[in-house]
Structure formats: structure tokens, C-alpha cells
Amino acid sequence: MAIIHPKVRGFICTTTHPKGCELNVRDQIEATRKLGVREDGPKKVLVIGASSGYGLAARITAAFGFKADTLGVFFEKPGTETKAGTAGWYNAAAFDKFAKAEGLYSKSINGDAFSDEARAKVIELIKNEMGGQVDLVIYSLASPVRKLPQTGEVIRSALKPIGQPYKSTAIDTNKDTIIEASIEPATEQEIADTVTVMGGQDWELWIDALNAAGVLAPQARTVAFSYIGSDITWPIYWHGALGKAKQDLDETAQRLAGKVGGSANVAVLKSVVTQASSAIPVMPLYLSMVFKIMQEKGVHEGTQDQLDRMFRDRMYRADGSPAELDEKGRLRLDDWELRDDVQGACKALWPQVTTENLFELTDYAGYKKQFLNLFGFERADVNYDEDVATEVKFDCVEL
């Protein structure tokens, strides 16, 4: 038991609130339920990277929107009797509790999703507990490091531009001030390493392993998540080291299309507040602006809204028609964010933002609240001065 308040260092909140995290998951489930349950979608789903952000949202949509049995893989720190674990641990525990209450199969694996050991365990569980095959594989890993399964070598990714230093207005999120951020360009080695960590190699290793074991259903589909953004963030993102990794993901999808019976696609999603996006310089300012503009235009979506739309309006359409894809074969869920009127308003606003008018011109207050929400804080229905149980156990295999 402990009384837990937020402690923020840089772009990480080092504390988490178990009750707040559970209520976050409950809210996401309720949002999905409101759209009604469909019987004509995925039935057995594997989510790699299932404990937060878009991966968690995909798992919720599959289970509570389509009654699917789900197996989730993630790397989180469990809470102990005296110390809170990571937010993802409590998210996964809450998902498991609600799914089981609904009579759905739910199992989780806590371990390194880049490892062969994780793949072997997943295959064993699919064979023994899920009827032998899965019909959807969601790949949603966002990690700064990857340990290569063959050699044990640890590779690190770099959030850097390519070619020249990147200078831009940004928010110092510790001081709530506008600063000029400058980031030196990535070396060739850093670019290659970023592709190794964040590109499609591991996604392909997963599909190859599942294929070899015969645990993919004849019409199995697989989707990996990506972000492209607009030219505001391109220097650090799409034209940076991370963009090279995401282009590798696109090429991987083309190859995987020949390896699965259904389809293999990259889904390009909108920018949302996640632990992953907070780490990208310039993103907090861009997010604060784009949220305000999209809310004003009535097209704002959260993480769960995006995945609900991806499943219902793209992948599993009620009329059975195939999803439209862009010229690279991608599912585009960033269509509303990239509308000319939205991006035009962002570009007009960008040079006007100062420390003095930051809270007035943008939804930075909303950004900060959503950031703390990720860790279970800033909820009106939680008393943060009360003791909360930090040790939460659930149906999870520890690797």
C-alpha cells in the first residue's frame, strides 16, 4: 500500500497510480462498448506491445468490440507490496480483469517481445489455449532499445534528424516555457541502429515464427503501427532516423503480404499523447496545437477512437468491402489530422506561440493533463491522498 502522487522527470513520470490506470482502461472499454458489439471481425488476436497506447487500444477494440480472445505481450515492471509498478502493468491487469468478467479469454506475457523466448511462449499458448491459430496479429512495439535474439547485442535508437541539425521552437515541459530546441543530426550508425530497433525486422521475425509453427489462420491479417505526421514534424520524424525505420516497416509490410493468407499492412495513426510521443522533441508543442485545432473543428480523436475507427471503418467493414489503402498499401487513420485546414491552422499558430500565451493559444493544459492521465493521475474520481494497493496480480506469464 502507498499514497502516490505524480513525480515528473523530463518526459517521464516516475510514479504511477494503480487505481487511476484501472479507471483509464475502464473508460476506454466503455467508449468501445458504446459503438456496439460486432460478431464479424477477428476472433483470436495476438497483440505485441499490448500494455499501453495504441497496442492496448487495439486489444480493447478486439475484445470488447468484437468479442475476440486476446493474448498480449509486453515488457512492464510489476508492482510490489511497497512500490508501484509501471502504468502498463496496471493497464494490462485491468484489461485482464474486465475481459475475464466478460467471459473472454485473456492471457498476457511479461517479457522481452524482441526475444525468441517470447515467440516460443506465444506459440505454445496459441496451440494449447487458443484453439491453435490466431487470425489477427497487431504489432505495436515502441522501444528505445532492442536486444538482438541471435547475438544478445543491445542496439539503441536515436530520435535525430538526418543531414543537418534541427532547430525548432519547443516546450520545456518541466518549466512550461517556450525554448529553441536544437538537435544534432544522426550518424550513419545511429540511422542504421534506429532501423534495427524501430523498423520491420522484428515484425517479420514474429510472422515467420508464427508461420513456421502453423499458428496463423488461413486468412490471418497483420498490422503494424506507424506515424508520418506533417512537414511541421518531418525534420525530426519522417525525414529523420525514425522515418527511415518507418519506411523499413512499409517495405516489410510488402514482403509480409506474401506470407500471410489475409493481409499485411502498416496503419498510419494520428499523433496522440503516449509515453512514446512525449519523448520526441517538438511533439508536445505540436500536439498542444493540433488538439486545440481539431477540437475546434470537431474532429479530435483519442487513442481508443483511432483504433475503433481502424477496426470498424477500415479493416472489418460491416459490408465486407476491402479497406481503401494509400499508394504504399497503408491504412490511413491520420486523414483528419492531415486535412489542409487543420495543418494550415497549425502552421499559422506555430510562430505566434510564446511562453506568455502558451496556455491561451494552445491546449497545452490538456496535453499536460493527458500526459499525467497516462500514469493514472489527474482523474477527478480518484482521491490521491488515499492509500492504494500497489501489488496487483493477474493472469500473466513472467519470462
Curated annotation (Swiss-Prot):
The keyword DNA damage does not apply. The record marks 76 as: Plays an important role in discriminating NADH against NADPH. Keywords: Fatty acid biosynthesis, Fatty acid metabolism, Lipid biosynthesis, Lipid metabolism, NAD, Oxidoreductase. InterPro entries: Eno_Rdtase_FAD-bd_dom, Enoyl-CoA_Rdtase_cat_dom, FabV-like_NADH_b, Trans-2-enoyl-CoA_reductase. It comes from the Bacteria. Transmembrane segments: none annotated. NAD(+) binds at residues 49-54, 75-76, 112-113, 141-142, 246, 272-274. Its EC number is 1.3.1.9. It catalyses: a 2,3-saturated acyl-[ACP] + NAD(+) = a (2E)-enoyl-[ACP] + NADH + H(+). Substrate binds at residue 227. It is an enzyme of class 1 (oxidoreductase). The active site is at residue 237. GO terms for biological process: fatty acid biosynthetic process. GO terms for molecular function: enoyl-[acyl-carrier-protein] reductase (NADH) activity; NAD binding; trans-2-enoyl-CoA reductase (NADH) activity. Pathway: Lipid metabolism; fatty acid biosynthesis. The keyword S-adenosyl-L-methionine does not apply. It holds the Pfam family Eno-Rase_NADH_b. Belongs to the TER reductase family. Involved in the final reduction of the elongation cycle of fatty acid synthesis (FAS II). Catalyzes the reduction of a carbon-carbon double bond in an enoyl moiety that is covalently linked to an acyl carrier protein (ACP). Monomer. This is Enoyl-[acyl-carrier-protein] reductase [NADH].
